[in-house]
């Protein structure tokens, strides 16, 4: 996809967002329901794509990606109305005779840049949150998970108008073109070096970013632990997804 096509997608989403169509809570809920039904309809395709890209078994695919994503979408559907209501706040002395409220409003046109290690979970969960909050979304899946990217694109094309959600496939050129655009929010999951580049590019427009860049994850084993059970659970957590998990145990702190 070339620069002009990406600019057109972002422009179309911004025009759509300015209609305030996404501000309607019922519209947000309907979008989430469509996402849930599309994921359910393509469960077999998702499992096959994860097997193709990462070698995941169907059980692991459901436990780590399909089932967890559906659970998050259900959670958003159940709570989107409550989250969207104005909240009463205490007033200061100057406004003592007033009623003070805060109202959550959408960011606007958002970008989700997803990784290869959990290509569905780390796309669908932030997508559900963005839709529940009333945003439009451009998704950039990882080029290192092409089968998963193709299924994500199919799911989103079936569930959404491109003015609400669009998937942009490709590699480095598409990443560069996307980061040249002005966004209202960027959600990136990936490496520290690329995260620094995303933050640098976002800073030119003061775009708020959420960067999930992994880290070092301790595992604490205290004196009351059953060592056989603890060892089995630590090994499971470390080698789930062949160790490619940002919160997999990295070191132990043993009492």
Q: Where are the regions that the model predicts?
A:
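N-terminal Rossmann-like NAD(P)+-binding subdomain of aldehyde/semialdehyde dehydrogenases
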Residues: 1-101
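Residue-level signal for inorganic ion chemistry
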Residues: 28, 73, 134, 165, ...
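Short gly/ser/thr-rich secondary-structure transition/capping motifs
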Residues: 89-97, 167-170, 233-234
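Conserved small-residue-rich beta-alpha loop and adjacent elements
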Residues: 91-160, 206, 228
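A structured beta-alpha segment of the ubiquitous adenosine-cofactor-binding alpha/beta core
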Residues: 99-101, 167-184
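Short beta->alpha connector loops at strand-helix junctions that form conserved
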Residues: 135, 140-142, 169, 189-190, ...
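ALDH superfamily catalytic-core signature
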Residues: 160, 193-255
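A glycine-rich helix N-cap at a beta->alpha junction
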Residues: 161-167
């Amino acid at each position: 996809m070339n620069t002009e096509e990406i600019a057109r997608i972002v422009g179309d989403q911004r025009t759509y967002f300015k209609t305030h169509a996404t501000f309607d809570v019922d519209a947000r809920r309907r979008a989430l329901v469509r996402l849930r039904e599309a994921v359910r309809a393509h469960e077999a395709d998702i499992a096959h794509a994860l097997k193709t890209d990462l070698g995941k078994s169907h059980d692991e695919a459901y436990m780590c990606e399909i089932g967890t994503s559906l659970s998050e979408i259900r959670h958003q559907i159940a709570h989107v109305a409550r989250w969207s209501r104005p909240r009463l706040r205490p007033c200061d002395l100057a406004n003592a005779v007033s009623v003070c409220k805060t109202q959550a409003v959408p960011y606007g046109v958002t970008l989700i840049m997803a990784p290869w290690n959990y290509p569905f979970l780390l796309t669908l969960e932030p997508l559900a949150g963005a839709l529940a909050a009333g945003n439009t979304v451009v998704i950039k899946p990882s080029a290192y998970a092409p089968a998963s990217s193709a299924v994500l694109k199919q799911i989103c094309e079936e569930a959404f108008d491109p003015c609400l959600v669009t998937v942009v496939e490709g590699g480095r050129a598409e990443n560069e073109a996307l980061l040249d655009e002005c966004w209202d929010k960027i959600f990136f999951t990936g490496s520290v070096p690329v995260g620094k580049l995303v933050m640098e590019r976002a800073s030119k427009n003061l775009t708020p970013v959420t960067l999930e860049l992994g880290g070092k994850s301790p595992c604490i084993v205290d004196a009351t632990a059953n060592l056989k059970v603890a060892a089995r659970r630590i090994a499971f957590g470390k080698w789930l997804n062949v160790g490619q998990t940002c919160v997999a145990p990295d070191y132990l702190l043993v009492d």
